[in-house]
């Protein structure tokens, strides 16, 4: 199957480059395609390598609407291309599982540190922790679950009215 795996970055074989410590990898997922958010926020080209993995297992794990799946995969490829144009070293690969994609990336590039923004699912978070990925706080939501847990601690009842009042005070709205 020609073109099954698109490699957008290759390691440099120069002896001088091999003496340098490996740069960290920022792993970006299909629902985190934002240059100003998560583990990519504030990063400049040359500071990190960016990893994208199309996982067969994840794709086949549920019945996706064809157009939605196409949209997500296309958005990942386009975002990878944008980062490449910006000067980032990008490794875009397909693998059986996310873990296999990460292991292949680490084996190829000698990466010691992999960062990713917390996934939106608990299962995804547990998987990344199991793989030894350093997680960066997910800033895609208005209220992080840690903030909510702090607010909810010790309350006898959780009501939307109380939560909204707390949010308005916390965010300076109204």
What is each residue range found by the language model?
Residues 31, 55, 95-96, 119-121, ...:
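An acidic- and aromatic-residue-enriched active-site/binding cleft used to recognize and process polar
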Residues 101-174:
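Beta-rich, aromatic/charged-enriched effector core domains that present basic-aromatic interfaces
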Residues 11-93:
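N-terminal beta-strand-loop-alpha-helix module at the start
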Residues 63-108, 113, 118-126, 155:
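N-terminal Rossmann-like or analogous alpha/beta NTP/dinucleotide-binding catalytic cores
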Residues 8-24, 29-42, 138, 146-173:
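N-terminal donor/sugar-recognition subdomains of glycan-related enzymes
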């Amino acid at each position: 199957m020609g073109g099954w795996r698109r490699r957008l970055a290759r390691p440099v074989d120069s002896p001088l480059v091999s003496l340098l410590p490996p740069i960290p990898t920022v792993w970006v997922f299909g629902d985190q395609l934002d240059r100003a958010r998560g583990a990519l926020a504030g990063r400049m080209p040359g500071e990190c390598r960016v990893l994208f993995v199309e996982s067969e297992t994840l794709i086949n794990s549920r019945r996706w609407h064809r157009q939605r799946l196409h949209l997500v995969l296309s958005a990942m490829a386009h975002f990878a291309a944008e980062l490449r144009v910006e000067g980032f070293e990008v490794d875009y690969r397909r693998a059986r599982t996310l873990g296999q994609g990460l292991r292949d990336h680490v084996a190829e590039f000698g990466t010691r540190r992999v960062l990713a923004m917390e996934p939106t699912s608990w299962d995804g978070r547990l998987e990344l922790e199991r793989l030894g990925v350093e997680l960066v706080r997910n800033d895609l939501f208005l209220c992080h679950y840690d903030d909510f847990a702090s607010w909810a601690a010790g309350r006898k009842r959780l009501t939307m009215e109380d939560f909204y009042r707390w949010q308005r005070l916390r965010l300076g709205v109204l």
